[in-house]
Amino acid sequence: MRQIVLSLLVCLGLSACGPRGLVRSEFAGRSNEGPKKVLVVPADFVITEVTFGKTEERVVPAERQASNTLSKHVLALGQKQSAFTVVDFAKLSKPHQEVLLQHRALFATMVSQLLLVKEDAVDVWETKQQYFDYSLGRGMAEVSTQTGAETAIFIVGKDKVRSTSRKVLDTFASVLPIGESLSAQPAAVAVGIVDLRSGDILMFDNEMATRKALTDDADVQAMGEAVLTDFRDTLKSREGGKTGGAK
């Protein structure tokens, strides 16, 4: 976990994190010194199952499994590193947990717009790619004061899976024009790195995969790792002596 988070935060000292992610503009050119304490908020996944009759239902056990799988995988990736302390979300007071979960929900509502900025999908947001300045507000400042954590990581995801009967229908749909198939529906994971004191979103990135599902542990691990790949690559480049210029 520490290696991944450090590599994410090292990007604050660079002019960019490669072609995938968005970095808050005012941090470009800043020192690459990372925070001493980082708080990782449990991932929030929304998984719905589509039946033969096209009704949709939330699959809560699958959502919890995906969240637990990702958390364990991310922690395993950073076990050998000790650059800074990871604050255990489970040990926070209930009021502080609720505050963080509320801000995670707020982040989730912003993802669609952040994607438009990242993909340069709407001309009016072209400036936002260069001057990225979204914020969740100062509602988490007390959590930072009480825990000493400077930064939080929010991860959200969404997927549609098929019931057995729906899979049978989609098998026929692949060879006969009898209806819309869900086989091409992409699973999606998005990550936000947030300053706890100001609420500023420091970085944002996402991963979408058509042939992966959040109900598959290996796929969850792969998507969670993919969404952080560019940031880890940036750390490796910095360690190799490469530096990025400020905008």
Identify the residue ranges that each predicted region occupies:
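Sec-dependent bacterial lipoprotein signal peptides
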Residues: 1-15
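Homeobox/homeodomain signature
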Residues: 4-7, 28, 36, 97, ...
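N-terminal segment of the mature soluble domain
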Residues: 53-158, 200, 204-206
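C-terminal/domain-edge helix-coil "capping" segments
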Residues: 17-50, 69, 136-151, 156-247
